[in-house]
Each structure stands twice: as structure tokens, then as C-alpha cells.
Amino acid sequence: MKGAIIGDIAGSIYEFDETEESLDFPLFVKNSRFTDDTVTTVAVAAALMEGKASCCGYIEPLRRQLRYWCRKYPDAGFGGLFRCWFLADEAPAYGSYGNGAAMRVSPAGWIADTLEEAQALAELTAVVSHDHPQAIKGAIAVASAIFLARQGKEKEAIAAYLRSHFYDLSRTLAQIRPSYGFTCTTDDSVPEAIECFMEGTDYEDTIRKAIWLNGDTDTQAAIAGSIAEAYYGVPDALWQQALPYVGDEEMKGVIRQFYENYIGSRGNSFDFNRDKQEI
């Protein structure tokens, strides 16, 4: 979750502003900010914690928490159709195939006890607004990668699973970047974000690669960063740099509670002895 938030903040200033060929660019500057990626991720975390604790289902908390948090931060950079959705007290999902479901799904990968649960929760977090098959697939793919990384699976095993069930993942970043540009469609942004994780050497390198790709910089850094967190962990020094850009105490409280309940409590030190078994 922190991995998604840091990626979002770091990528926020580079959207539509091509980075240099080098990966050596500042991650945090005066104009950096959290965007809709962070707001909706926090909303999903709050909803899943509520649903897990109450055993009364997740759909109603997801709708309510997304509307609450998005209305609280209405200028965070939401798309027009999603804005109409969260401003309406009652509105159905609207068939979006955008990457909004994948960018907010990371809590599902952490809160789940099994891969099947992670995938089921990911679908629920998507369908309340983004019910197109592309959007659902993207959310499930990202949550699956997070869960498998949490379990200590090697990148090769994670990639093999994702190729088998979701995306081709045959193009390298060097092949993607020359002709790549901004897109927020799931099928044209989520596989590329996953590839940033696959080629990243640590958490920071992963989000730098996602920004360097020159696509949907904040969202792709959030997606790649969410997977990289589960694999590498997030350096505390980097989180401390990002923290001043995070919202108010209520937002920070949800993040803190989620880590206390579902990440720190599971003893994830990120010093994994990774197995190399097939998934």
C-alpha cells in the first residue's frame, strides 16, 4: 500500500512531461502530490478492513468508502465518468476499462489469506465502478502478483503465472518505451507496469522505471510500486520522504491501521528465503 502511494506521489509531476533518458530524476519536489491513485487505495483499504471485520460483505463498504474518500478529495485528478459515479449517491458501475481498478487494488493482495481470496477481493474492488472485463482482469492480475510476491515467489514464477492467466509480458521496457505514450486503458498500461516490476532491481528502481516509461506516470508507478513493495519492501527513508505529501491525519490513520492489522502483524520483514517452486 505504501508502495502504491509513494509511486503515485513520485509520478504525479511527470505525467505529460517526458523524463530524460536517465533514471536519475528527483522523486519528490515542491509540486509533488498524492492523486486519485492514493485516495482510492486508501478507500479500498478502509473498506476491506471494514468488510473483513464485520463478515457482512464488501460491496457496500467499497461503494461507501470510495464515495466518502473521493468526495473528501474531489480535486485529486479523477476521470469524468468516475467523478459522476462517486458524486451520485446511487449509481451503477459504468463499464470502464480504465486502469482505475488496478491502481487501487493493492490492499486486496495484502489482506487475503490465499491467492483465491486475493483474486475474489480484487474483483469486488473493481466491479463497484469498473466492471469491464479488462478492468477486472487488471485488478486481479495486480493483486495476484502482490500476493505471490508476499509468499516469497521468485520473479520468474510470478511472471510465469501472470503470462499463463493474464498477459503476454513478452516485451521489454527497452522495446516498449520508444513508441509509448500516455494511456489509461488497462490492457495498454497494466502489463507495462508489471514489466517495470519485473525489470526493477529494487523498490526505488522499479518506480523510477515506471515513471521513465513516459506513460500514465503516477498510476503505473503506483501499480509497479505496489508489487515491488510486496517483493522488496519499501525503504523507511523513502516513506519518510513521501509522508509530508500524504493527506490528513485521517488518511494516515487508515494507512497505519492497515499496516498494524494486515502487514506488520504478519511478520513481513522482507528478508525472504524465496522458494523456486512452480505456482
Language-model-detected regions and their locations in the chain:
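Structured, active/binding-site neighborhoods that engage oxygen-rich ligands
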Residues: 1-279
